[in-house]
């Protein structure tokens, strides 16, 4: 057998994958090749079950495609764990066959590059004896983390750059950098993905770390259960024994006094022991209704970062990544159509793309701009009836207690100019209006004035907490 396939495969995957993904998942594999009776076989050994599962779910298909490309025939792939003492049960071998061969469905691989129109080979998993669950796998399950939510799979842009940078710093130095890390933003903007990515990165670096992701409602249920079963000592021991606590949607703590009391003491115990706490919320800490002041003050001990609605380019990138995961080809004009008309959150973007894909498949048509417009006609119609600049101007004027006429005036005093700039920024972000059209609506101003206003607000938000808070509140009000 030609023994050069694995080096060939490594070289190709290194070109196709981000360096971090390649080093973490592919470079750690050990390969053995054989060609018994003319059947080409490749056995890959993963260092642990976590890597094994990740490679099987995301990269096995692509390795099989490269094997068929190199050898000119389907190859048999086997993925296993190292033999230690007693013989380990290998993962079920996977044979790569041409399309049309009998077998099961192809595994999705969002990391693989787009494939040609020819049907790709399918991975057929042979039945095997159930494998024993390892201690590492059980430990990971207890974290309640989602293995799909990693820094690698997170689309980044201006909307989440600061939050991502802070999250990566926490992942590299848990308990010492930004404790607690408080991430806030609207629904569907990727807060949960980001905090899972922190947990996954920490666990991958040190599987001995005791990590727990918990939604606030589950934490509340744990408190109620401890109260009913009179087991508060066990409850306290568990939560205070964690190395990292990730708690999602803390706004739902409102008016749950006993739950807040228990979390307050757990928070103190963990931070004093330099254990990391990560929190998400849909609003800035001081705006949470029904939350004790002593908790809010402790959230200020670390770092508070906001995730904003994604900008146009980021929305397009999110759609293309989702299309890649769905293994469908989406032209830029289709992605731009969806991205221009859906501005609020990632879930809406992905939902719209799913609708287009389903519509195209149901009607037996390819995904085109015309098909996308047909599939989303109700959504596009609703969008066209959305915010007007006049409504934005009135809302901002009421908020800052100035006159709507001031939006059109030539006054340059700070109390007038800043709200006007905020209104221009909101008009650019929340409506499809062009810069010249926005300028015309603000007293016939030039488009360069609008551009300057938008850039000013964007830059000021990074350092001016009050302005950032104002823009966040106005955005939420205008979106209803």
Curated annotation (Swiss-Prot):
Residues 73-143 are annotated as: Domain II. Residues 144-360 are annotated as: Domain III, AAA+ region. It comes from Azoarcus sp. (strain BH72). It holds the Pfam family Bac_DnaA. Keywords: ATP-binding, Cytoplasm, DNA replication, DNA-binding, Lipid-binding, Nucleotide-binding. It is found in: Cytoplasm. InterPro entries: AAA+_ATPase (IPR003593), Chromosome_initiator_DnaA (IPR001957), Chromosome_initiator_DnaA-like (IPR020591), Chromosome_initiator_DnaA_CS (IPR018312), DnaA_C (IPR013159), DnaA_dom (IPR013317), DnaA_N_dom (IPR024633), DnaA_N_sf (IPR038454). GO terms for molecular function: ATP binding; ATP hydrolysis activity; DNA replication origin binding; lipid binding. This is Chromosomal replication initiator protein DnaA. Belongs to the DnaA family. Domain I is involved in oligomerization and binding regulators, domain II is flexibile and of varying length in different bacteria, domain III forms the AAA+ region, while domain IV binds dsDNA. Residues 361-480 are annotated as: Domain IV, binds dsDNA. GO terms for cellular component: cytoplasm; plasma membrane. Residues 1-73 are annotated as: Domain I, interacts with DnaA modulators. ATP binds at residues 188, 190-192. Oligomerizes as a right-handed, spiral filament on DNA at oriC. GO terms for biological process: DNA replication initiation; regulation of DNA replication. Transmembrane segments: none annotated. Plays an essential role in the initiation and regulation of chromosomal replication. ATP-DnaA binds to the origin of replication (oriC) to initiate formation of the DNA replication initiation complex once per cell cycle. Binds the DnaA box (a 9 base pair repeat at the origin) and separates the double-stranded (ds)DNA. Forms a right-handed helical filament on oriC DNA; dsDNA binds to the exterior of the filament while single-stranded (ss)DNA is stabiized in the filament's interior.
